[in-house]
Amino acid sequence: ADTALMLQALAGYDPGDLASIRADVPDYVSALYRRTSEFRIGVARSFFFEGLDEDIEEVTDRALAILSDLTATVQDVELPMPTVRVVPVEPYAYHAEYLEQQETRALYQPRVLSRLLTGADIPATTYLEARNELTRVQREIETVFSEVDLLITPTSPLLPATIEEGQNPPDVIASSLRNTSPFDAYGIPTISVPCGFSQDGLPIGIQISGPHLGESAVFALAHAYEQATDWHNQQPSLA
């Protein structure tokens, strides 16, 4: 519900923002209470379910059983996978003004700075090839949504890293973002909701994704799942 309230305040066309979409803004808060019994669910097992931690696999299967009860059908689907990434280029372009000035560049956390700088030397031809590839993938994902209304995937294949494991950030970041970054390429709305814990008490999430401008359906199923479970209300003891 918090995410719906936030998006309700943020959404809308802004002529000063080239990435802004000229489209009507739905009532996202009312969408939380939309019926989900007619939704067709697609489960993207290829790639997204590969190499899952055992606890994540078990918790995800339980979540899928609950989602099956909340919706009309659940079926496996294949998603197109982008073979190139433009992610390093666009963040660098956004931050370039600040990265070029020593006084503002020094404000960046070293690991963040290192990631941003990977986009500095990518040739324009490589970037254009990547953009064309993403256009192809985005068109293909549209055909998937002719068969299903929403997609389900695990949020991460691995449990949260320990402080020690976090000392090797490239590996940790790549693993933690493996299941989320493709949806950046698809350009579709996606939300992660808590669906359980590992045997050691570490949180596990499941992703719900919808078609372009399909936030209302995403909110509806996420809210229905949270009403059917209690994971989102559980908090660690701070004592």
State the predicted function of each range.
Residues 4, 66, 122-239:
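Glycine-rich, small-residue loops and helix-cap segments
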Residues 76-81, 187:
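Catalytic beta-strand/loop signature of glycosyltransferases that borders the donor
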Residues 1-58, 228-239:
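A short helix-breaking turn/cap at a secondary-structure junction
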Residues 4-8, 29, 61, 92, ...:
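Predominant activation on well-ordered alpha-helical scaffold segments within soluble catalytic domains
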Residues 27-30, 52-78, 96-105, 127-148:
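Acyltransferase
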Residues 33-44, 85-142, 192-205:
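Short helix-loop capping/hinge segments that flank enzyme active sites or metal/cofactor-binding pockets
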Residues 54-56, 83-93, 162-168:
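Short glycine/threonine-rich loop-to-helix capping motif typified by GTGT followed
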Residues 10, 45-48, 79-83, 156-158:
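Glycine-rich beta-alpha junction loops
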